[in-house]
Amino acid sequence: LNFTFGALVSLFTMIPFVNLVVMPVAVCGATALWVKEYRNFFLNNQTGEFSKADYTFTKVNSTSLSTETRTGEVSPNVRNGDIRKQ
């Protein structure tokens, strides 16, 4: 399927004036092909440091507000390299 798609794109790039349109169409077609054919394979069979990450974004309606305040002071232990919790 990939070889056929690439061969057709290569053939259409050789035709004058068609080659001006074929690249944007090929990018859109390749994106649609990847989503249809390969997206589920990569989402379900991941390995590596981001394995099983959820790349589907959902809008979260949250009205929570943090009341945490920070002073901006730097602990002297940071400069010594000792940043363990006290």
Swiss-Prot record:
It is found in: Cell inner membrane. InterPro entries: CysZ_sulfate_transptr. Residues 64-78 have a biased composition (Polar residues). GO terms for cellular component: plasma membrane. This is Sulfate transporter CysZ. One of its GO terms (molecular function) is high-affinity sulfate:proton symporter activity. Keywords: Amino-acid biosynthesis, Cell inner membrane, Cell membrane, Cysteine biosynthesis, Membrane, Sulfate transport, Transmembrane, Transmembrane helix, Transport.
